[in-house]
């Protein structure tokens, strides 16, 4: 083959440099390369060195084929070696001027971007060297890289600005420390830089966090374990929290503060639960004792909707109050010689001290207008009562303070008032105010679309199809009756507390507006460290009573204690007894008012407020739908709780009779939370401890008899609450009232001879109370049944006192026999259900109910006033006012009408403020 032969492209060797050059020799048959290149490729595959003689030399750009290296003249090889040597020397040179000259000699196009960038970098370095005279010294010390450190190079390009970040002098080929995770091996990332392919990355170890200086100083000191409360040291008596692994508590403080068992504290301490009340934790968690502020989370739109709902429910009550005002004024005008002119009406300026109930017991809940006699300094309270047959206008008279500040002992008689020429109407709420308030409330209601009001006797649309699933654990219905004609009335709403977390009250309000009770599950939070054991609570209270004798109330005015010992002799009556055993018995009934509950058990009191199932209705301070919340000074605040009810019975004879709450109803709404249920008998140590604490109280009272009498006199009214619960007392039991135990025969030697031992048993069933709840419309039938069977019911009641109103006085309890007779004669059947631990029973106002406790229970009771049942509450208060004074003194005085008027006024005012601040939000709300 001649060297000048032109080979077609399809037969040419495929060897090329990838750009322009390609071998012009002919490829071998069946191969893609020529003979020379094929042999070179074979040597490279076998990892052998290619001989210099077999390499081809490219021809210059003028043309010509490649020739072998053996054909090159010696002079030409020398020239080539000189050229290569010069290029190597130029690379070694570190001077920027020499590199700039070499670049200038390169024959490249002027539009080459890479060459332009290199030239720009070199120019910047030359200019920087001229500005910095000491650059040569820095270059020697830093190994030639100092001029690139700390400076950022930028280049303005047609489409933007390009920046070249400077390299790090120490870690030139390692990624940034921010890209390395703590405690893991870093990944070496080589930064792309000119002529830096062969530079090996510098080794780097695991990155670690250096401790803070304060931690290093504290770490040098030996960690000392101290009790979180008392600061006591010691390893043996301290219990460490496994949750935080930081707090320690001694055994004495745990027992003294009643913070649960050792296992509960070890699992999760009070600091972790947020129930610690020490100074440090109180400063950190200042808002723990307050009610949970659910309104802060609720949006303004939801708040306005709730206020609108309250106004819509209370507007009929306001209209009724204004109608009664109008009737009072018109009737009084007719009495004055037929003069139809409107009498002069003045607003009341009476303080809370002056607004006391009259001697005849007229409660201020129904007092709207008063007639004041200027001569006798008395007040004639007027109220329309259409139920009385004597007169269409009922007038009750009571004394108030005279101008000299002394109470008038005489009561202004009707004939004396009739002779008075200076009679003036005294209105606690001016008619102008209530009439304007009614107009404003109607305007608010017209802008709000209420949901469709269903018939009280119709079924709930949310519960359709759930009746068949009532037996399942996730059902929202609970079967409480089986023989009602209306199948939907056999079931009660049975939600969990989680169902109310998203302000989902529509389903609840559907059942609540019908007057049905609601049972809420899972109210008590899991993992609570508070101890609700009744014996422990009573002992804790007695200890506080001993420590603070002069400041606290008399404990026996709130507790009824019965202690007894029964001995058993087994064996021959004549001979020596083979076995001599005894059994301790304890009966404990107590009712703690809200003030005493908060004073003696602040942690338990705060826990009750935190676990309220529906805070919008039940929060006593911030409940948006609670009419009794956030009252002004002009309205007497009622004592709605929460209160604590303790019922404990131990021993064989005390386990047989049932402690019951007799049939009756409340004048307001109520929620009852079952906190604790036990069947564990009391131990001898607990009985001895109670006796010892009660003896200490009696010893202190004997020294200060005046304080004891004064305390019993002040709190004597509270003893009547214990009459609601009845139980059969055995002859061997000893009744202790007022810290003086009449059972003096229980000496220490006799107690030590008792070998009673008890073991705690796990309760398979956690229910402790059985409820029977009747409907509001069944009140008249219940009264008629009690009237017909009063002799049978009185035989069951040991008190045998005169009864004016069986339901208001809570005088009788209907057992299974009487409930069956009631169903047979009047077709009235209650909702009967069992209350388990952690369940809250929400009861509407006016619903008759009775409770039978099968076990020892501790429950909290809180009363509230919902807008749906204000009318029913007013009706029940009127019935209560017609009873004798002895009965009314037991009831909690509530001023329902005043609270309703104040709630409407505040709701209308707040709605206007919220809607006027954001006009767009108001438009979205109303449209």
Swiss-Prot record:
Tissue expression pattern: Expressed in inflorescences, flowers, roots, siliques, leaves and stems, especially in the vasculature (mainly phloem), with highest levels in floral organs. Present at high levels in flowers, shoot apex and young seeds, but observed at low levels in dry seeds, root apex and anthers.
Phenotype caused by lack of the gene: No visible phenotype. Decreased hypocotyl length. Delayed flowering associated with reduced FLOWERING LOCUS T (FT) and CONSTANS (CO) levels due to increased H3K9me1/2 level at CO locus.
Molecular function GO terms recorded: histone H3K9 demethylase activity; oxidoreductase activity; sequence-specific DNA binding; zinc ion binding
Annotated keywords: Developmental protein, Metal-binding, Nucleus, Oxidoreductase, Transcription, Transcription regulation, Zinc, Zinc-finger
Gene3D superfamilies, alphabetized: Cupin
Skewed-composition ranges (Basic and acidic residues): 330-339
Residue ranges constituting the WRC domain according to the UniProt record: 7-52
GO (cellular component) term, any one: Set1C/COMPASS complex
A biological process term (GO) from this entry: transcription initiation-coupled chromatin remodeling
InterPro entries reported in the protein's UniProt record: JHDM2-like, JmjC_dom, WRC_dom, Znf_RING
Positions of the UniProt region annotated as Disordered: 30-92, 330-359, 701-736
UniProt subcellular location: Nucleus
Residues reported to bind Zn(2+) 1: 227, 230, 250, 253
Biased composition annotated in UniProt, kind: Basic residues: 80-91
This enzyme's EC code(s): 1.14.11.-
Residues in JmjC domain copies: 601-881
Subunit-level organization: Interacts with the FBH transcription factors FBH1, FBH2, FBH3 and FBH4.
UniProt name for this protein: Lysine-specific demethylase JMJ28
Gene assigned in the entry: JMJ28
């Amino acid at each position: 083959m001649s060297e000048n032969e032109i080979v077609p492209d399809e037969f040419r060797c495929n060897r090329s440099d990838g750009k322009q050059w390609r071998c012009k020799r002919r490829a071998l048959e069946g191969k893609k390369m020529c003979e020379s290149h094929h042999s070179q490729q074979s040597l490279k595959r076998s990892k052998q060195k290619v001989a210099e003689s077999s390499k081809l030399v490219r021809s210059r750009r003028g043309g010509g084929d490649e020739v072998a290296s053996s054909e090159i003249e010696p002079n030409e090889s020398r020239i080539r070696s000189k050229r290569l040597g010069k290029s190597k020397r130029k690379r070694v040179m570190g001077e920027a001027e020499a590199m700039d000259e070499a670049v200038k000699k390169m024959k490249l196009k002027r539009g080459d971007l890479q060459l332009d960038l290199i030239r720009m970098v070199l120019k910047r370095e030359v200019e920087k060297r001229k500005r910095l005279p000491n650059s040569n010294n820095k270059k020697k010390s830093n190994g030639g890289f100092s001029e690139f450190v700390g400076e950022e190079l930028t280049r303005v390009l047609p489409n933007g600005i390009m920046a070249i970040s400077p390299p790090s002098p120490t870690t030139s080929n390692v990624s940034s420390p921010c890209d390395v995770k703590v405690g893991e091996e870093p990944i070496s990332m080589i930064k792309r830089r000119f002529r830096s392919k062969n530079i090996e990355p510098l080794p780097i170890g695991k990155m670690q966090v250096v401790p803070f200086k304060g931690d290093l100083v504290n770490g040098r000191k030996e960690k000392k374990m101290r009790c979180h409360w008392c600061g006591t040291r010691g390893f043996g008596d301290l219990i460490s929290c496994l949750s935080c692994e930081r707090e320690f508590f001694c055994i004495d403080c745990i027992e003294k503060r009643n913070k649960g068992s050792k296992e509960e504290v070890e699992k999760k301490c009070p600091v972790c639960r947020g129930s610690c009340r020490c100074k440090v934790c109180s400063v950190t968690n200042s808002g723990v004792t307050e009610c949970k502020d659910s309104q802060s989370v609720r949006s303004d739109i939801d708040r306005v909707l709730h206020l609108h709902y309250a106004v819509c429910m209370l507007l009929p009550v306001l209209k009724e109050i204004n109608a009664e005002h109008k009737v009072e004024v018109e009737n009084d005008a007719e009495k004055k010689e037929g003069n139809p002119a409107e009498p002069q009406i003045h607003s009341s300026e009476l303080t809370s001290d002056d607004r006391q109930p009259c001697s005849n017991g007229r409660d201020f809940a129904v007092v709207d207008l008063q007639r004041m006699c200027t001569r006798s300094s008395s007040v004639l309270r007027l109220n329309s009562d259409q139920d009385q047959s004597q007169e269409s206008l009922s007038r009750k008279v009571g004394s108030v303070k005279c101008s000299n500040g002394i109470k008038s002992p005489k009561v202004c008689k009707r004939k004396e008032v009739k002779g008075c020429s200076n009679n003036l109407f005294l209105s606690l709420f001016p008619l102008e105010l209530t009439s304007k308030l009614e107009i404003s409330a109607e305007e608010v209601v017209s802008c709000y679309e209420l949901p469709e009001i269903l018939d009280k006797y119709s079924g709930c649309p949310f519960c359709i199809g759930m009746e068949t699933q009532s037996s399942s654990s996730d059902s929202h219905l609970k079967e409480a009756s089986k023989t009602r004609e209306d199948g939907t009335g056999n079931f009660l709403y049975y939600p969990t507390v989680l169902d109310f977390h998203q302000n989902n009250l529509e389903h609840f309000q559907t059942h609540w507006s019908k007057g049905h009770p609601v049972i809420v599950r899972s109210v008590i939070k899991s993992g609570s460290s508070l101890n609700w054991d009744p014996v422990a609570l009573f002992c804790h209270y007695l200890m506080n009573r001993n420590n603070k004798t002069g400041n606290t109330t008399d404990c026996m005015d709130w507790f009824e204690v019965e202690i007894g010992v029964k001995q058993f002799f087994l064996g021959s009556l004549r001979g020596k007894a083979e076995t001599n055993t005894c059994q301790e018995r304890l009966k404990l009934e107590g009712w703690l008012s809200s003030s005493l509950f908060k004073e003696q058990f602040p942690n338990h009191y705060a826990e009750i407020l935190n676990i309220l199932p529906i805070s919008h209705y039940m929060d006593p301070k911030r409940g948006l739908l609670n009419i009794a919340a956030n009252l002004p000074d002009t309205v007497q605040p009622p004592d709605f709780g929460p209160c604590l009810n303790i019922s404990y019975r131990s021993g064989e004879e005390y386990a047989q009779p049932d402690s019951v709450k007799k049939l009756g109803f409340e004048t307001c709404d109520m929620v009852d939370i079952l906190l604790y249920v036990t069947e564990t008998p009391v131990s001898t140590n607990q009985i001895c401890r109670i006796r010892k604490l009660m003896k200490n109280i009696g010893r202190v009272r004997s020294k200060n008899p005046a304080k004891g009498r004064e305390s019993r006199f002040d709190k004597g009214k509270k003893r009547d609450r214990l009459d609601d619960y009845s139980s059969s007392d055995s002859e061997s039991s000893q009744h202790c009232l007022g810290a003086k135990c009449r059972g003096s025969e229980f000496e220490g030697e006799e107690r030590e001879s008792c070998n009673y031992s008890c073991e705690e048993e796990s309760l398979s069933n956690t229910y402790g109370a059985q409820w029977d709840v009747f409907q509001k419309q069944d009140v008249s039938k219940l009264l008629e049944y009690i009237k017909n069977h009063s002799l049978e019911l009185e035989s069951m009641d040991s008190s045998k006192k005169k009864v004016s109103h069986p339901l208001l006085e809570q005088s009788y309890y209907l057992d299974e026999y009487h409930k069956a007779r009631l169903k047979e004669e009047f077709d009235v059947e209650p909702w009967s259900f069992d209350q388990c631990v952690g369940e809250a029973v929400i009861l509407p106002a006016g619903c008759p109910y009775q409770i039978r406790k099968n076990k020892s229970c501790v429950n909290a009771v809180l009363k509230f006033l919902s807008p749906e049942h204000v009318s029913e509450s007013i009706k029940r208060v009127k019935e209560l006012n017609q009873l004798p004074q002895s009965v009314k003194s037991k009831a909690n005085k509530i001023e329902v009408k005043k609270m309703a008027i104040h709630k409407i006024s505040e709701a209308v005012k707040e709605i206007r403020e919220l809607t006027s601040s954001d006009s767009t939000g108001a438009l979205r709300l109303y449209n």
